[in-house]
Amino acid sequence: MDHSDVYEPYTFSGKHHVRMYDFSKLTPMWNKDASTPPRKFADMHIASTVAMELYNIERELLNMGHLSGMETMMVDVRKSPEMIPSTINMRDHITRLVNKMKPICRFDERLYSLCGELVHLRIELREVPLDTWLLSKKLNLKYEVVDNIRRYRAHIEMDMLRFYGSIHPWLKRLGLQSALKYEEYLVELEDGKKESLCQFFVRLAAAAATEASMKKPFMTTLTTGVANWRTTFTTFFLALANQLFVPSTPCMLFLGREGTSTASCYLMDPRTNNTQDTLKAITEDVVPHLLARGGIGISLQHLNGKFGLMHVMKVLDSLVMAANVNESRPTGICVYLEPWHADIMSALNMRGMVAAEESRRCDNVFLALWSCDLLFKRYLRHVNGEKNVIWTLFDSRASILTKLHSEEFEKEYERLESEGLGVASIPIRDMMFAIIKSAASTGSPFILFKDACNRHYITNTQGDAIAGSNLCTEIIQKTDANTNGVCSLASINLARCVRNIDGNRQFDFDALRYAVRLATVFVNAIMEGSDVPTEKSHSGRERNRSMGIGVQGFHTAFLSMGLDLCDERARSLNKLIFEFMLLEAMTVSCEFCERGLPPFADFSNSYYARGRLHFDGWANVELAAVEEWNMLRDRIVSAGLYNAQFIALMPTAASAQVTEVSEGFSPLFSNMFSKVTSTGELLRPNIQLMEELRTIYLDNENQRLATIAALESANWNIQTALGNKPECHSLLKYKTAFDYDQALLIDLCSDRAPFVDQSQSMTLFITETADGTLLASRVMNLLLHAYKAGLKTGMYYCKIRKATNAGVFCGDGELTCSSCVL
């Protein structure tokens, strides 16, 4: 998809270098000569408008040869207005049409786009007028949001007109999965009606503008001109509708609505050491957050006695299963344990095919190892030939270890070991065997490096170390028995930062910085207005005001510039992107304080107050913006930072579907992703690949179809299907995550790590050998590579592609893994 005409260059002006944008050039107003007029949202003549659009699409499908033998409506309402079908009949017809067309999308990317447009027509048939939407009890908008929408209605309707003029037609043709995902996010209203896509963006922008207007520095950082509710609304509305940045799923579902939480991540460390207190903590803290649809990471390291941990795991497993029944946003729990926990071997065998017994099976709870460096140091001693290297497990008598990290941890561990306080000793090879076997068989445990997380934190944590991360392993926050970690997320759509400049596709850093600036203000605004389930979470949010700004479309952006992820130009660009993301986010946060807002609570005790920034903890970091960093460093010492944390690279599996770009910072999972679910087939073709293929065979449709057939036979592996075709040489860049050398992908994570002050949800993608086996050493070597690179997250999921077919085991229990040679 060509997005290059959406954003114009940004200019730099004002004391704080605000990136201004002339929004009158962002999207053109409605073209009166267009075949379909903009939505008349005042009187909602929906049926006739949709019938006309449906007629045009069916004509287009007929011309493409895709309607042969299929039922059509083909009603030209301009000639026969009395023949307009009912909205119910049109919706049913659209559903049948999409279901029949979906399989053919594998061969024609234009059809994939048209199917998306059909789904948007189905959405439009359920729209309601703006007043009806505002008063919906099922939507339950906050009073102050409703009040502002009414007060500034004339201004909002001008932005809505702009949306229907050019943004909406572009969104409607993004693709089928985008349309289906938007349909899922739009709020269900009374009488079978639904929030419209335009109302969806109005809700998000109005809610954020309402909160931003309560703290003037939020608004003034967006403009050097007049800063008020209207200009703030328009800024957010146009950026959101144009997908420059994308809010988190909880935000899209709940922002602006009463009694909801928009935070994505909650981190807990109850520090309970018996079953009774742990169950109390679950009841009082875990359950409310599950019901608020938040993802939870919880450390149970202190629950380290006899007959406790696995029974509590079973309780959590049942809670997750019950909480996710019939929910639009399923959630989950990840339990964090250190590898010296007395019950660690039982925990490693609680999921999937490795579950020792049904009574201890916990398929709805994830496990993460909060691993000390010492575990890997001992394994390296074994690899280097040392005999009888062991790993010792401890019970609660060694609880002091949870408070320590790095050298202090190692000294205390070895002291306890020498005094004979261990409850079991395991050969280090067997310990690693158990970890890798569980990962290869179930997708987890996730693996994070405790020492790296603590070393690079904003305060000195020695003596009270950080105990865990979140559900998806990208959030690193200090928690305790009285304070939960909380993080609100948004992702920058990097594909929207690629532009045609002098005939070449280039990355626009002004667009990137503008997107980060908007996302920083947006996330801070929604944090102000969001409810949190418990006082502990309220305390954590207020103490740190931690943000998690990530990315999506990383691979899509690089492909659109013709770059392989691992060539030198790509590696250089990778570092620059994340350096400027951190720079802009911290600049905005500092500006908040310069304009009168207080720094986060622990600022005076943080390294920031002494002028130390995150990348200062890394060796040999080369900065592109040395002068700007030096100035910002001085400003931070002088004024402070409003937020404690900024960049977190989360998975964007759901939100990247609305943008039709690659997930997070990972390579594309497949060039033709297909997954059968309980609601039907989820299909996502690589549109860039299919469009380029059409260009190559522009005058030879038979050859194009033959090439696609070859790709189908090769499970859409480019090298296998097209490696010998000289005309397809340019397509070899379309490698998938499984085609890349995983060590090189880890190197990309390492290159950007100095600028990621939280962490990265780094998944490993591994293919079995031809005989259907998987060597444990392959996984282990990658973990060692991540450890030596100094990463905080060593492995999120371990995804295994079967050698015999396209089946991929993703750790969700839907497919079984192949056998492993360990």
From Swiss-Prot:
Protein's UniProt keywords contain Oxidoreductase: yes
Active site per the UniProt annotation: N470, C472, E474
Residue numbers marked as site, Interacts with thioredoxin/glutaredoxin: C817, C820
Keyword Disulfide bond: yes
Site (Important for electron transfer): Y796, Y797
Feature type site, description Important for hydrogen atom transfer: C265, C487
InterPro entries, per the entry: HSV_RIR1, NrdE_NrdA_C, RNR_lg_C, RNR_lsu_N, Rrm1
EC number: 1.17.4.1
Signal sequence, start to end: none
Annotated positions binding substrate: T249, S264, C265, G295, N470, L471, C472, T473, E474, P651, T652, A653, A654, S655
Listed GO biological process terms: deoxyribonucleotide biosynthetic process; DNA replication; viral process
Pfam families per record: Ribonuc_red_lgC (PF02867), Ribonuc_red_lgN (PF00317)
Enzyme class: oxidoreductase
Chemical reaction(s) catalysed: a 2'-deoxyribonucleoside 5'-diphosphate + [thioredoxin]-disulfide + H2O = a ribonucleoside 5'-diphosphate + [thioredoxin]-dithiol
Cystine residue pairs: C265-C487
Quaternary structure annotation from Swiss-Prot or TrEMBL: Heterotetramer composed of a homodimer of the large subunit (R1) and a homodimer of the small subunit (R2). Larger multisubunit protein complex are also active, composed of (R1)n(R2)n.
Family in the record: Belongs to the ribonucleoside diphosphate reductase large chain family.
Protein name in the entry: Ribonucleoside-diphosphate reductase large subunit
Species of the source: Gallid herpesvirus 2 (strain Chicken/Md5/ATCC VR-987) (GaHV-2)
Gene symbol of the encoding locus: RIR1
